Amino acid sequence: ILALEYLRKHSDQTIEVSDQAASQPKVHLGMQKGEVFYIKDLLYSLMLESHNDSAVAVAEHIGGSVEEFAEKMNRKAREIGCKNVCFVTPNGLDVADADGNEHSASAADMARIMRYCAFQSPCHETFLEITRTASRTIQDESGNRSFYLANHNALLSQCAEVLSGKTGFTGKAGYCYVAALKKEGKAFTVALLGCGWPPHKTYKWADMRKLDQYAFDTYNWYDIFDREKTFPEVEVRRGVKGTTALTLNLPSEKQTFLMLLRADEKPDIRYEYPTELEAPVHEGQEVGQAS
């Protein structure tokens, strides 16, 4: 998503492959040092096939180095609300930085990242276009070599509610899958980490189907504000009346405030308002907030 947002603001569309990018281990595209590729083609390579060399080539071009790009990743993750991430590489391999901090992210943060990519980023439509592509053939800029890419997200063709998804594997993390789901006006992001190790490559699909069904069966939209809620009257100093009533007053565009909840869940709403006001006080005056 950093690369897509970069492309919105910059005119350069191609990448020359470095020695470091070309020397990445499998799974890789097999690019060679000095070859030139279109950035967007390498994003298909990255998102459909998880090619390590494509990830490094894109990172070096946008960040100047893998290390600088990793810092951009960490900064972006914090901006969108992630709390437990430490990105060291653009391809997610099991490595540590110079201080010994291992490349890592929690399941909750991976779900937050997918939420941003699939629903919130200004480039979310392009992200979905790439990740929903079943297959694609790309070439280097010269047209001398062609590469066939196939999407490994099996649920795209099996479950209509699967909007996007990305598979992954490392020796420490096991088989992983992060997905965005949407159906009947409900949307969810789900992150599965450690869904088995070889040879159990298909466990993640069964686990995702269970969570998919659970989410749509269990969560429904509820209006979280109690329209009948009453508040204690507030003292008005130096006023004609000694006290005034408070009411919940939502803007017209938010007369309903819906949240996906289980039937047994109650939202934790905190009302903040003063215990006294100074005159003059006007009808409709905002004196507190709900959070």
Q: What annotation goes with each model-predicted range?
A:
Residues D99-S291:
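Domain-terminus/edge residues, biased toward the C-terminal soluble/receptor-binding domains
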